[in-house]
Amino acid sequence: MITLPAYCHDPFSYRRRKTRVVSIGDVPLGGDYPIRIQSMTISDTMDTAATVAETIQLVEAGCEIVRITAPSLNEAENLRHIKAELHRRGIRVPLVADIHFTPNAALKAAEYVEKVRINPGNYADKKKFATREYSDNEYQAELERIEARFKPLVLKLKQYGVAMRIGTNHGSLSDRIMNRFGDTPEGMVESALEFVRICERYDYHDIVLSMKASNPLVMIQAYRLLAARMAEEGMDYPFHLGVTEAGDGEEGRVKSAIGIGSLLEDGIGDTIRVSLTEDSVHEIPAAYAIAKPYNARLAAPNQKASLPVCVSTRTAPLPQESRNPYGYRRRPSDEVRLGDLQVGGAQPVRVELATTVPLADVDGTLAQIQALSTPAQPGAPVCEMVRLQATSGADLEAFARLRQRLPAAGLSVPLSLCLPLALLDSLPTLPEAAKLITAPDPLLPEGPWHEQVRRGAALVARHGVGLEWTLRLETIPHFLRAAYGATIEGLAYTASRLVELCREVAVPDVMVSLDTAPAVAAYRFLAAHLDSQGLAVPLHVKTPALRGRTAALFQGSIWLGTLLCDGLGDSLQIDSDLPAAEAISLSYNILQAARLRMSKTEFISCPSCGRTLFNLQTTTERIKSRMSHLKDVKIAIMGCIVNGP
């Protein structure tokens, strides 16, 4: 079993990371305060009127902290006029000066703003892309040089009562860090901690840290490693979360939701910014959508509705995870055959979606299957398995009629059918589905429950059909509920019992899925428990029912993206009321953001700021219009040299 430093209190149960409170002007950050929402202006900082107008627009949208770039002394000095005009208009939002390359601008900005952001990769270093082997003495000399450049800012911020963000960017690590640690999360963390240690030597502690990357996986790993390293060193500074250069549209929101939401799920993060290549005001509703469920827990910590499902009612040790939170490794699983589709093992994570009309409506169901399985344009991704729901004998008759019509419609997509095990148990022959999805009767005593499972599994095995056990808290059988309660642990023990019974009757193609609201904790516990029992059954990761586009986009991305970045999941399903095209697009955008399946061109574009000397939004649109056909290609569209050569 891998022994790694802990990055959070408990991977199976939400508890916010404890931090000190750092005040950004009148806005307290960290501790038990809500997750703060912030953004950054894209106007020219020398254009006072435009920057003031944009700041007011952000504040009216709900932005709590506004960052403004100060690339030179001129912009740093103009922050005084911007702040004065905002105060004249009754706007007291905290301002943050964004500094790269120019310590003199940071020293001037400290006189006017509530926080200064510096990048440890370029505050005292210039990027030369030089390869050099540093001895320990040479490296120490470099740290002393950096301290000499950085100390004046630390002392001035301390004198003025101004906070600092030490913000590492994956794309702008110094040559010194790159040569010793490489382009890695470890390098990102050490880059920041070097500056934190200097601050602490001068008894300055109003510090916020960030570990931004355009790749959500790298960003997640870096923040986790930072949390673990800081815990080891007795540091408790709050974190600013964000995926840099996330892009625009749905893709940018999905990347941000996965990166930021994965960390918030573990209680990590105190302020967030959703970086979009759009007008800055569009970032605010996206940020609130991500933060809302976590701030709701903070607002009502003792209310049952605000708490996740209990992990366990027992004092027994919880299972040890085999996943490495600081590096990606997909959970090993058996490969199963579902009709013509292979799932698990080395197969790509598959996309399964459900129809939303009753099965009795054969015409409507057929139309939805066609919409889900037919590419919108040549080469476009499609749903790889369509999920149907049957609750009665009449539904099974409708399913048989539907099957007869598929060849004439030119449809061959594998179908999965969800039905009660009692209904399956009563059938003389199985429906012609690639996979049957069911759960046994939880009210049966242990012996009859085992017999029902064995009969159903044996029937499935004889017909060569795949089997998925789908579990909710209500499906935990009473004899297991007595031991484990209606808990995540109860779900995991129910799943392992079902898989073991299937092995007894030699069912080769078995999967497990869960349908419970704390999806991340539940699937993590399930995977850890199954692995501890030597059961490499594939996992179908699905969301609970999500209604409306906002919930599907943000909550679906957070839950599924977190699990996929943890290496969990062999197929995925968003349970939503989205139209077919939108559900397919969102599913593949999640897979692409998690770096698991590339289905289109990957655009990495920064959100623009006062440094940008051209219209980044229209430029991005123009490049996309000409290059979106280049599947498997990554294209970076950058507004300046901060995160690029």
Question: Positions of the model-derived regions?
Answer:
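N-terminal glycine-rich anion-binding loops that anchor highly charged ligand groups
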Residues: 23-38, 43-62, 66, 71-74, ...
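Catalytic alpha/beta core domains of metabolic enzymes, predominantly
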Residues: 134-150, 154-155, 176-325, 431-438, ...
